Amino acid sequence: MDPPTAGAQSLGAAEQPRGLQLPSGREAPPSPGTAFAPADHSSQEKATENATDRLANGAQSIPHDSPAHGEGTHCEEEGFAEDDEDSDGEPSPWELSEGMSGCLPKEQAGDLFHEDWDLELKADQGNPYDADDIQGCLSQEVRPWVCCAPQGDMIYDPSWHHPPPLIPHYSKMVFETGQFDDAED
């Protein structure tokens, strides 16, 4: 079942969905008294063959007003109706009617929040944390290495600017006497 039909049936819509309708098994069979006239599709088949030939020869697309599409069928094939109104003649709920286009809702100034900085400063007077405390916290959050930097004379140590090596390097190893005595046994 195609998505428009499934959506219409799931929502219980009374209106039939637009677009190319495929026969389903639940439709009522034609009445026995109905006579079928043979339809002449030879002109449509020739136009379709011509359009296919043009596409095979390198055409990027075929315009909708070409004879390859039947009259008035190109919109139904794509799933769009030619007019913007439903089959009952009423505009869709997401569209504005022609008379309502100038009556758009306007933003009201009363909806905006008004800041009173003086009132906020008075409220913050009893706050034990002042702006310096807040700035100090922010600088440590942004630059966490600041708290680890030495405060005295700056001596260059390359280990501050490089990640630690995967294999530890010991420049000076000191062994205690008797440290490896049990390893020899």
Swiss-Prot record:
Coiled coil: none annotated. Keywords: Acetylation, Chromatin regulator, Nucleus, Phosphoprotein, Transcription, Transcription regulation. GO terms for biological process: chromatin remodeling; muscle organ development. The keyword Lyase does not apply. Residues 42-52, 66-77 have a biased composition (Basic and acidic residues). It comes from the Eukaryota. GO terms for molecular function: histone binding. Residues 1-109 are annotated as: Disordered. It is found in: Nucleus. It comes from Bos taurus (Bovine). Interacts with PRMT5. Interacts with histone H4; specifically interacts with the N-terminus of histone H4 but not with histone H3. Interacts with CBFB. Found in a complex with PRMT5, RUNX1 and CBFB. Histone-binding protein required for histone H4 methyltransferase activity of PRMT5. Specifically required for histone H4 'Arg-3' methylation mediated by PRMT5, but not histone H3 'Arg-8' methylation, suggesting that it modulates the substrate specificity of PRMT5. Specifically interacts with the N-terminus of histone H4 but not with histone H3, suggesting that it acts by promoting the association between histone H4 and PRMT5. Involved in CCNE1 promoter repression. Residues 78-89 have a biased composition (Acidic residues). The modification Phosphoserine is found at S66. This is Coordinator of PRMT5 and differentiation stimulator. InterPro entries: COPR5 (IPR029289). The keyword NADP does not apply.
